[in-house]
Amino acid sequence: MRVIFILFLYLPYFIFSQNETDYNITINTGEAWDANIFYKKTGTPLRPVIILNSSGEELFHEVWPMQGNDFKINDNNKITFYDLETDGWMVMDSLHNIVDSVYCLNGYVADPHDFIALENGHYIMFAYDQQPYAMDTIVEGGDPEAIVEGLIIQELDADHNLVFEWKSWDHFH
């Protein structure tokens, strides 16, 4: 009876911890891209971030439950990805050590879809800013109490000082 109990106790772990890769390379000719491929497939069950070489061999495979969006080599030749737990961007060296973390300033939350780490050490991030806006002043029948999303672009230097900020709202009024 104890063995059955232990089996049922650990069964979900064995079922949901499987992170088998689910891809097939069907064509790989000499004209194919000859570089590593970085990706993370999202969804349930949790899937790993993966680096594949051009032959399809896994070079890196690790499950990061709340991290890994936009997993790529950036312009500064470092690996970057978004962390959903902290709402910021992580920067890794070639040994997969986190060497920096970057967040939007002035109360904004970085968007998880794109991040530019420049060669000069600067970072560019995007954020959204929701504001009430009387859309009935723009279009006939518009909602006078609409919530409209504006865009924020921030550039931070290597010390995370704000050196540039653009707000789409500055161009609405």
Q: Where do the protein language model's features map onto the residues?
A:
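Histidine-/acidic-rich catalytic cores in large beta-rich domains
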Residues: Q18-H173
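Bacterial Sec-dependent N-terminal signal peptides
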Residues: M1-E20
